[in-house]
Curated annotation (Swiss-Prot):
<dbReference type="Pfam" id="PF00425">
    <property type="entry name" value="Chorismate_bind"/>
</dbReference>
<comment type="function">
    <text>Part of a heterotetrameric complex that catalyzes the two-step biosynthesis of anthranilate, an intermediate in the biosynthesis of L-tryptophan. In the first step, the glutamine-binding beta subunit of anthranilate synthase (AS) provides the glutamine amidotransferase activity which generates ammonia as a substrate that, along with chorismate, is used in the second step, catalyzed by the large alpha subunit of AS to produce anthranilate.</text>
</comment>
<dbReference type="InterPro" id="IPR005801">
    <property type="entry name" value="ADC_synthase"/>
</dbReference>
<comment type="similarity">
    <text>Belongs to the anthranilate synthase component I family.</text>
</comment>
<dbReference type="InterPro" id="IPR015890">
    <property type="entry name" value="Chorismate_C"/>
</dbReference>
<keyword id="KW-0934">Plastid</keyword>
<dbReference type="InterPro" id="IPR006805">
    <property type="entry name" value="Anth_synth_I_N"/>
</dbReference>
<keyword id="KW-0822">Tryptophan biosynthesis</keyword>
<dbReference type="Pfam" id="PF04715">
    <property type="entry name" value="Anth_synt_I_N"/>
</dbReference>
<comment type="pathway">
    <text>Amino-acid biosynthesis; L-tryptophan biosynthesis; L-tryptophan from chorismate: step 1/5.</text>
</comment>
<dbReference type="InterPro" id="IPR005256">
    <property type="entry name" value="Anth_synth_I_PabB"/>
</dbReference>
<feature type="transit peptide" description="Chloroplast">
    <location>
        <begin position="1"/>
        <end position="87"/>
    </location>
</feature>
<dbReference type="GO" id="GO:0009507">
    <property type="term" value="C:chloroplast"/>
</dbReference>
<dbReference type="InterPro" id="IPR019999">
    <property type="entry name" value="Anth_synth_I-like"/>
</dbReference>
<keyword id="KW-0150">Chloroplast</keyword>
<keyword id="KW-0456">Lyase</keyword>
<protein>
    <recommendedName>
        <fullName>Anthranilate synthase alpha subunit 2, chloroplastic</fullName>
        <ecNumber>4.1.3.27</ecNumber>
    </recommendedName>
</protein>
Length: 621
């Protein structure tokens, strides 16, 4: 039969090219030994495999950056690769192993469902995606990241911190002044060894959220927990999971990195550490390459009709109460106590759509740079945030306030006209500059003298339905500080609190009736090496999981659904000339815009196809 020899010729991609064709006969199918693609820290030896397919003998090879493949007749990896792992383990105590696979058969949505079953909504896990804004259209971000089964969980409520070490089967509880010191101290014990082949994305570490009330660990005297509004949900203030296993999708190069971080156990041999790490990696890879992957509901989408879900009438504040709070805030502004304050209220929407279905719909309704589906203890977060809270990479910190908003135009010409109008709006530009100054002050607290600068002032960022005025503030972290110190300095940002920030937050405690929880805090990841990428928790729905409802709903299919309550919080920036009616309407519009994802999920996944209609157009988010 014919044999085709194929080899990879392009670095970074799994590409193949036909080299030669020969003819020979194979009387009996050969026996194939088990195959393991070698993983390395730098440059592994070559590995290849001959396969008989029909009447052709195929020779496959693959290449990553500086990686070659060769035939390996056993599960043992090469001496060269093992030597490199051994050297890395001598330098540090965290060493990543990875496997690169084709991603053309897999999506981040499907990969998440392979790791977390549909009925396991209490399992800590996450899916991070990104859509980069563009002038005419948005482009999908290069990387998506999926993770499940954290080895350690940290849950803080007030000053009580619970640490669940699943690897050691230990659960501890202690009272501390600052719960963020707990993960910070754990990280001080690490010495991670990076490798060049891994992508420029989050590849493992802490994932979770920091609530708005995290600021009370820093401003203990002016913003004590005792002065906080009613805590009607009892959600954790800090909720983190440590993920040794992640899957990173590279949408540009059409491949996925399956990554496992090996914790070097000094009481075990290097061989044992290496073998256990490879077994964990093999197990993780097999879970996303299941012969029978989970079936995802297809959904039916009919856009641009006029069918919407129920109006968001239930809120933590009546319209009259919110307007009275606006009037009182204006009195403080006129008295010179503050310049601006952001007052929010929390709306409620009941639904039989599953939060994961709502996340899938949100990707269509409101694609944004920080898309997140995050399951943690006590709640599920479904987020579509446009704004960085803090980015820290190689000790360079970035804060990018977004303030000043106008809708997108229906045509490119109208877009340009609206952009000029936005930049000519003195009120919105003045508010933006005030918040940029606040950002400079926050970044300056933890930066080297002279390193703080505004790189982009009053830039315009285009999103799916709106455009924002954006500025970028950068600084270089002081030598004796870490990313955690930078997070303490900026959380929460002025765009969700006001200016001066602490005084505005004192008034928020007086004027808002319930705690904000995750809203206006931050969510994201802290890498093993200390880099941090935290998004501002705006346009974020919170689904409490610690409350169960007896209501079940049965559709034409046999699946029975539980009822969920979505908490959608939105705020408005109050200044001296604010109109209470307009500010209340702004909160309603922002919340209703996010609720369009629930409308789409209900019509796509719950109703019959012929009734599936929804309009995702949003004028102002």
């Amino acid at each position: 039969m014919s044999a085709v020899s194929i080899s990879a010729v392009k670095s970074d991609f799994f590409t193949v090219e036909a080299i030669a064709v020969t003819h020979h006969r194979t009387p009996h199918p050969p026996h194939f030994p088990s195959l393991r693609f070698p993983l390395s820290l730098k440059s592994p030896p070559a590995t290849s495999l001959n396969l008989v397919a029909g009447s052709k003998l195929l020779h496959f090879s693959r290449r990553l950056p500086s990686i070659k493949c060769s035939y390996t007749p056993s599960l043992d990896l090469s001496e060269e690769q093992f030597t490199k792992f051994k050297k890395a383990s001598e330098k540090g105590n965290l060493v990543p192993l990875f496997r690169c696979v084709f991603s053309d058969h897999l999506t981040p949505i499907l990969a998440y469902r392979c790791l977390v079953k549909e009925d396991d909504r209490d399992a800590p896990s996450f899916l991070f995606e990104s859509v980069e804004p563009g002038s005419q259209s948005s482009n999908i971000g290069r990387y998506s990241v999926v993770g499940a089964q954290p080895t350690i969980e940290i849950v803080a409520k007030g000053n009580v911190v619970t640490v669940m070490d699943h690897g050691a089967s230990l659960r501890t509880e202690e009272e501390v002044d600052d719960p963020m010191m707990v993960p910070q101290k754990i990280m001080e014990e690490w010495n991670p060894q990076g490798i060049d082949e891994l992508p420029e994305a989050f590849c493992g570490g802490w994932v979770g959220y920091f609530s708005y009330d995290t600021v009370r660990y820093v401003e203990k005297k002016k913003l004590p927990f005792s002065n906080a509004p009613e805590d009607d949900r009892s959600l954790p203030d800090v909720n983190l999971g440590l993920y040794d296993d992640v899957i990173v999708f590279d949408h540009v190069e059409k491949k996925a990195y399956v990554i496992h971080w090996v914790r070097i156990d000094k009481d075990r041999s290097v061989e044992e550490n290496f073998r256990e790490g490879m077994n964990r990696l093999e197990s993780l890879t097999s879970r996303i390459q299941d012969q029978k992957p989970p079936k995802m509901p297809t959904g039916f989408i009919k856009l641009r009709t006029q069918l919407f879900g129920p109006k968001l009438e239930k809120s933590t504040m009546t319209s009259e109460a919110y307007k009275e709070a606006v009037v009182e805030a204006k009195e403080h502004i006129l008295a010179g106590d503050i310049f601006q304050i952001v007052l929010s209220q929390r709306f409620e929407r009941r639904t039989f759509a599953d939060p994961f279905e709502i996340y899938r719909a949100l990707r269509i309704v409101n694609p944004s740079p920080y898309m997140a589906y995050l399951q943690v203890r006590g709640c599920i977060l479904v987020a579509s945030s446009p704004e960085i809270l803090l980015r820290s990479k190689n000790r360079k910190i970035t804060n990018r306030p977004l303030a000043g908003t106008v809708r997108r135009g229906k045509t490119p010409k109208e877009d340009l006209m609206l952009e000029k109008e936005l930049l000519s709006d003195e009120k919105q530009c003045a508010e933006h500059i005030m918040l940029v100054d606040l950002g400079r002050n926050d970044v300056g607290k933890v930066s080297k003298p002279g390193s703080v600068e505004v790189k982009k002032l009053k830039d315009i960022e285009w999103f799916s339905h709106v455009m924002h005025i954006s500025s970028t503030v950068v600084g270089e972290l002081l030598d004796h500080l870490t990313s955690w110190d930078a997070l303490r300095a900026v959380l929460p940002v002025g765009t969700v609190s006001g200016a001066p920030k602490v005084k505005a937050m004192e008034l928020i405690d007086e004027l808002e009736v319930t705690r904000r929880g995750p809203y206006s805090g931050g969510f994201g990841g802290i890498s093993f090496n200390g880099d941090m990428d935290i998004a501002l928790a705006l346009r974020t729905m919170v689904f409490p999981t610690n409350t169960r409802y007896d209501t079940l709903y049965s559709y034409k299919h046999p699946q029975r659904r539980r009822e969920w309550i979505a908490h959608i919080q939105a705020g408005a920036g109050i200044v001296a000339d604010s109109n209470p009616d307009d500010e209340h309407r702004e909160c309603e519009n922002k919340a209703a815009a996010l609720a369009r994802a629930i409308d789409l999920a209900e019509s796509s996944f719950l109703e019959a196809p012929e009734f599936t209609t929804i309009t995702p157009h949003i004028n102002n988010i």
